[in-house]
Amino acid sequence: IMPSLVGSEMCIRDRDYICAGRIEQGTMPKDPVMCKSIVSTPLADKVAEHYGVECRNVLTGFKWIGDQIAKLEAAGQVDRFIFGFEESYGYLAGPYVRDKDAIIGSMLICEMAAYYRAKGSSIKEELERIYAEYGRYLNKVDSFEFPGLSGMDKMVGIMSGLRENPPKDFGGDAVVKLSLIHISEPTRLGMI
């Protein structure tokens, strides 16, 4: 029985499989682009770099990956997009869908499992090969819910506090880098 893999681990396998397969089949576009959410594993950046793929890190939510596809499309370069993912098991393996697509993700996992089985390997063994090549990354997901308007107020307070007093350590580990991400896109909250 194979232990379950978290979303980032599965996406890393898919990313490596797609890149290696496109190179093997001669279908890798010039200057290929992959996108991932900022909460997804940084191991994806290393895999992308290995294959000469630009890795764009976007905010959480598939609309941001879709936005990158739209930008490529507007520039007449949509064929450069080869893969997008979030750690929540969401995949895009081409520019034809602009939102999380479980169907293509399921198909990719099945295809990948069959491919590696035919080679005498497995998804887990291939993930271990990737870790041996690039280093092992810890992937852990914590989720917090803040329902309703009071929840929104609480989130705003937490974020303000983090901006005004950035943490020196987090979970017992020293903070070595802090990135403040701010978007100026208006939200629909003012419409409520």
Q: Whereabouts are the PLM-identified features?
A:
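Generic secondary-structure boundary/loop-capping signal
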Residues: 2, 62, 88-89, 94, ...
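Phosphate-binding chemistry for phosphorylated carbohydrates and sugar-nucleotides
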Residues: 8-9, 13-133
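Catalytic-core signal marking the mid-to-C-terminal active-site face
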Residues: 119-184, 188
